[in-house]
Amino acid sequence: MRIEKCYFCSGPIYPGHGMMFVRNDCKVFRFCKSKCHKNFKKKRNPRKVRWTKAFRKAAGKELTVDNSFEFEKRRNEPVKYQRELWNKTIDAMKRVEEIKQKRQAKFIMNRLKKNKELQKVQDVKEVKQNIHLIRAPLAGKGKQLEDKMVQKLQEDVDMEDVS
């Protein structure tokens, strides 16, 4: 069973699903749903349509360069069936999928970390600009009042010592 890729959105196309468009020069385009086919007919660029894999990779939102993608390459050479080879291949596929998921999760966390740092810098900048909105007008008065009280007490103590 061969799972094809959609020409427009790079989504998986399972056997018996999707549609195929064959151009006059025998170039085959496969589409997973009518939405992709319509966008292709409108000559839209997949890298500019925000919901496609091509956009996400071009914008740096998804992992693009990784060794684990080498395993997804299409191989058209028929190989003689051997049960051992088949079992090893399936085990390797599972392992590769685990590794790929870990790397993608790490990539996403790094992306989010950068955004958090930028957000902190913006928050600090905004607070500094609008500090007058945060500070109450009488916020410093309490300390001044306390200082005056201390001075009066000291003066009273000094006056008693003199008398």
Swiss-Prot record:
InterPro entries: L24e/L24_sf, Ribosomal_eL24, Ribosomal_eL24-rel_arc, Ribosomal_eL24-rel_N, Ribosomal_eL24_CS, TRASH_dom. Its main location: nucleus. It holds the Pfam family Ribosomal_L24e. It comes from the Eukaryota. Coiled coil: none annotated. GO terms for molecular function: structural constituent of ribosome. One of its GO terms (biological process) is ribosomal large subunit biogenesis. Keywords: Nucleus, Ribosome biogenesis. It is found in: Nucleus, Nucleolus. Involved in the biogenesis of the 60S ribosomal subunit. Ensures the docking of GTPBP4/NOG1 to pre-60S particles. This is Probable ribosome biogenesis protein RLP24. The gene is RSL24D1.
